[in-house]
Amino acid sequence: MPGSALLCCLLLLTGMRISRGQYSREDNNCTHFPVGQSHMLLELRTAFSQVKTFFQTKDQLDNILLTDSLMQDFKGYLGCQALSEMIQFYLVEVMPQAEKHGPEIKEHLNSLGEKLKTLRMRLRRCHRFLPCENKSKAVEQVKSDFNKLQDQGVYKAMNEFDIFINCIEAYMMIKMKS
Protein backbone atom coordinates (compact mmCIF):
# COMPACT_ATOMS: atom_id res chain seq x y z
CA MET A 1 0.00 0.00 0.00
CA PRO A 2 2.65 2.60 0.90
CA GLY A 3 4.40 1.95 -2.44
CA SER A 4 1.25 2.66 -4.45
CA ALA A 5 0.56 5.81 -2.40
CA LEU A 6 4.10 6.98 -3.09
CA LEU A 7 3.66 6.24 -6.79
CA CYS A 8 0.38 8.23 -6.84
CA CYS A 9 2.09 11.19 -5.13
CA LEU A 10 4.96 11.11 -7.61
CA LEU A 11 2.57 11.01 -10.56
CA LEU A 12 0.55 13.88 -9.10
CA LEU A 13 3.65 16.01 -8.53
CA THR A 14 4.99 15.24 -12.01
CA GLY A 15 1.65 16.21 -13.53
CA MET A 16 1.64 19.47 -11.60
CA ARG A 17 5.14 20.35 -12.78
CA ILE A 18 4.27 19.63 -16.38
CA SER A 19 1.11 21.72 -16.28
CA ARG A 20 2.95 24.60 -14.59
CA GLY A 21 5.74 24.41 -17.15
CA GLN A 22 3.35 24.47 -20.07
CA TYR A 23 1.45 27.42 -18.61
CA SER A 24 4.55 29.52 -18.00
CA ARG A 25 6.01 28.72 -21.42
CA GLU A 26 2.76 29.75 -23.08
CA ASP A 27 2.66 32.94 -21.04
CA ASN A 28 6.26 33.82 -21.91
CA ASN A 29 6.06 33.30 -25.66
CA CYS A 30 2.63 34.95 -25.96
CA THR A 31 1.19 32.36 -28.33
CA HIS A 32 -2.27 33.05 -26.94
CA PHE A 33 -2.09 36.83 -27.44
CA PRO A 34 -2.90 37.13 -31.18
CA VAL A 35 -6.13 35.19 -30.71
CA GLY A 36 -7.36 37.48 -27.96
CA GLN A 37 -6.20 40.74 -29.55
CA SER A 38 -9.24 41.37 -31.73
CA HIS A 39 -11.54 40.34 -28.88
CA MET A 40 -9.86 42.85 -26.52
CA LEU A 41 -10.21 45.65 -29.07
CA LEU A 42 -13.85 44.73 -29.65
CA GLU A 43 -14.48 44.86 -25.90
CA LEU A 44 -12.87 48.32 -25.75
CA ARG A 45 -14.98 49.56 -28.67
CA THR A 46 -18.16 48.11 -27.17
CA ALA A 47 -17.48 49.68 -23.77
CA PHE A 48 -16.67 53.02 -25.42
CA SER A 49 -19.89 52.93 -27.42
CA GLN A 50 -21.77 53.22 -24.10
CA VAL A 51 -20.40 56.76 -23.54
CA LYS A 52 -19.44 57.90 -27.03
CA THR A 53 -22.64 59.82 -27.81
CA PHE A 54 -22.52 61.65 -24.48
CA PHE A 55 -18.99 62.92 -25.08
CA GLN A 56 -19.58 63.66 -28.77
CA THR A 57 -22.46 65.98 -27.90
CA LYS A 58 -20.37 67.74 -25.23
CA ASP A 59 -17.31 68.18 -27.48
CA GLN A 60 -17.95 71.54 -29.16
CA LEU A 61 -14.36 72.10 -30.34
CA ASP A 62 -13.16 71.80 -33.93
CA ASN A 63 -9.54 70.90 -33.19
CA ILE A 64 -8.20 67.34 -33.02
CA LEU A 65 -6.38 66.15 -29.93
CA LEU A 66 -5.11 62.79 -31.24
CA THR A 67 -3.30 63.86 -34.40
CA ASP A 68 -1.53 61.97 -37.17
CA SER A 69 1.79 62.51 -35.41
CA LEU A 70 0.51 60.29 -32.60
CA MET A 71 -0.40 57.56 -35.08
CA GLN A 72 3.07 57.90 -36.62
CA ASP A 73 4.62 57.41 -33.18
CA PHE A 74 2.48 54.30 -32.70
CA LYS A 75 3.73 52.95 -36.02
CA GLY A 76 7.37 53.96 -35.48
CA TYR A 77 10.11 53.07 -33.04
CA LEU A 78 8.36 54.99 -30.25
CA GLY A 79 5.19 52.92 -30.59
CA CYS A 80 5.71 51.08 -27.34
CA GLN A 81 6.24 54.22 -25.30
CA ALA A 82 3.41 56.08 -27.04
CA LEU A 83 1.02 53.23 -26.24
CA SER A 84 2.15 52.96 -22.64
CA GLU A 85 1.94 56.72 -22.07
CA MET A 86 -1.46 57.06 -23.75
CA ILE A 87 -2.96 54.24 -21.68
CA GLN A 88 -1.62 55.95 -18.56
CA PHE A 89 -2.91 59.34 -19.79
CA TYR A 90 -6.45 58.03 -20.25
CA LEU A 91 -6.46 56.09 -16.97
CA VAL A 92 -4.95 58.80 -14.78
CA GLU A 93 -5.91 62.12 -16.36
CA VAL A 94 -8.88 61.76 -18.70
CA MET A 95 -11.17 59.13 -17.18
CA PRO A 96 -11.15 60.46 -13.60
CA GLN A 97 -12.31 63.85 -14.92
CA ALA A 98 -14.84 62.22 -17.24
CA GLU A 99 -16.34 60.22 -14.35
CA LYS A 100 -17.53 63.46 -12.72
CA HIS A 101 -20.36 63.75 -15.26
CA GLY A 102 -22.83 61.52 -13.46
CA PRO A 103 -23.20 58.04 -11.99
CA GLU A 104 -24.38 56.40 -15.24
CA ILE A 105 -21.33 57.75 -17.10
CA LYS A 106 -19.04 56.77 -14.21
CA GLU A 107 -20.27 53.17 -14.31
CA HIS A 108 -19.53 52.83 -18.03
CA LEU A 109 -16.18 54.61 -17.69
CA ASN A 110 -15.19 52.26 -14.86
CA SER A 111 -15.89 49.33 -17.17
CA LEU A 112 -13.91 50.97 -19.98
CA GLY A 113 -11.03 51.70 -17.60
CA GLU A 114 -10.93 48.11 -16.36
CA LYS A 115 -10.76 46.84 -19.94
CA LEU A 116 -7.91 49.26 -20.66
CA LYS A 117 -6.07 48.08 -17.52
CA THR A 118 -6.55 44.46 -18.61
CA LEU A 119 -5.12 45.28 -22.04
CA ARG A 120 -2.11 46.99 -20.44
CA MET A 121 -1.54 43.99 -18.15
CA ARG A 122 -1.65 41.56 -21.10
CA LEU A 123 0.68 43.74 -23.15
CA ARG A 124 3.18 43.88 -20.28
CA ARG A 125 3.08 40.10 -19.88
CA CYS A 126 4.02 39.72 -23.52
CA HIS A 127 7.28 41.69 -23.55
CA ARG A 128 7.51 42.02 -27.31
CA PHE A 129 4.45 44.31 -27.17
CA LEU A 130 5.53 46.68 -24.39
CA PRO A 131 9.34 46.72 -23.89
CA CYS A 132 9.99 50.47 -23.79
CA GLU A 133 11.69 53.41 -22.11
CA ASN A 134 11.79 56.44 -24.48
CA LYS A 135 9.34 59.36 -24.33
CA SER A 136 7.03 60.21 -27.20
CA LYS A 137 6.89 63.86 -28.28
CA ALA A 138 3.45 63.28 -29.81
CA VAL A 139 2.07 62.05 -26.48
CA GLU A 140 3.60 65.05 -24.71
CA GLN A 141 1.84 67.26 -27.27
CA VAL A 142 -1.48 65.49 -26.66
CA LYS A 143 -1.10 66.03 -22.91
CA SER A 144 -0.17 69.68 -23.38
CA ASP A 145 -3.13 70.32 -25.70
CA PHE A 146 -5.44 68.46 -23.31
CA ASN A 147 -4.35 70.67 -20.41
CA LYS A 148 -4.78 73.85 -22.49
CA LEU A 149 -8.37 72.88 -23.24
CA GLN A 150 -9.12 72.85 -19.49
CA ASP A 151 -12.71 71.64 -18.86
CA GLN A 152 -13.29 70.97 -22.57
CA GLY A 153 -10.26 68.67 -22.70
CA VAL A 154 -12.10 65.73 -21.18
CA TYR A 155 -14.86 65.96 -23.81
CA LYS A 156 -12.29 66.13 -26.59
CA ALA A 157 -10.20 63.25 -25.27
CA MET A 158 -13.17 60.97 -24.62
CA ASN A 159 -14.75 61.87 -27.96
CA GLU A 160 -11.53 60.73 -29.65
CA PHE A 161 -11.15 57.49 -27.66
CA ASP A 162 -12.05 55.50 -30.78
CA ILE A 163 -9.05 57.06 -32.53
CA PHE A 164 -6.95 55.86 -29.60
CA ILE A 165 -8.33 52.33 -30.05
CA ASN A 166 -7.36 52.53 -33.74
CA CYS A 167 -3.83 53.56 -32.70
CA ILE A 168 -3.66 50.57 -30.34
CA GLU A 169 -4.79 48.28 -33.14
CA ALA A 170 -2.22 49.69 -35.60
CA TYR A 171 0.57 49.24 -33.04
CA MET A 172 -0.44 45.67 -32.23
CA MET A 173 -0.69 44.73 -35.91
CA ILE A 174 2.85 45.98 -36.50
CA LYS A 175 4.14 44.04 -33.50
CA MET A 176 2.35 40.88 -34.65
CA LYS A 177 4.20 41.05 -37.97
CA SER A 178 7.63 41.43 -36.34
From Swiss-Prot:
Cross-referenced PANTHER family:
INTERLEUKIN-10, INTERLEUKIN-19-RELATED
Q: Name one GO biological process term.
A: defense response to bacterium
User: What protein does this entry describe?
Assistant: Interleukin-10
Q: State the taxonomy lineage.
A: Eukaryota, Metazoa, Chordata, Craniata, Vertebrata
Provide the species name: Mus musculus (Mouse)
Q: What is the residue range of the signal peptide feature?
A: 1-18
Question: Which coarse location class describes where this protein primarily resides?
Answer: secreted
Report the SS bond pairs. C30-C126, C80-C132
Q: Which UniProt keywords apply?
A: Cytokine, Disulfide bond, Glycoprotein, Secreted, Signal
A single GO molecular function, which one? cytokine activity
